[in-house]
Amino acid sequence: MEFYRIGGVPNILANFAWEGAKPGSSVWNGKKIPLSHFLAKDPDWLANFHVWRMDWDEKSYRIFLDGELLNEMPLEKSVNAGKYKGINPFLKPQYLLLNLAVGNPQKGKGPVDDDAMPMRYEIDYVRVYKFPESGENK
């Protein structure tokens, strides 16, 4: 899940990615939801804590924000095509990274504007659960 400006408009991105056929490439399945969608429900949305959730089972994976499904991807579609052809990364052991990435020097955008600081990146807690082997997660 990312917060990103597209054409100057702030969006929440709910992305899945895996290896593409060309070396170093990725295949993306992403959904962009304008921040205004969340602000229309709650004008104070930016000041509040939110619950991000990712569920996956043997059939698909799903990204939720505050209980709202933002993106869903069938597991069968996320099979690597390059060096690791035929391997589905979501059937391998996983780890979790929590990261606040700012700026994008790779796209020539230059350094982060100091006037945009300070920014807040607060995490209250992280929980990891394992659903029963049957895949029941409802």
Q: Which role does the model predict for each range below?
A:
Residues 1-138:
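GH16 jelly-roll
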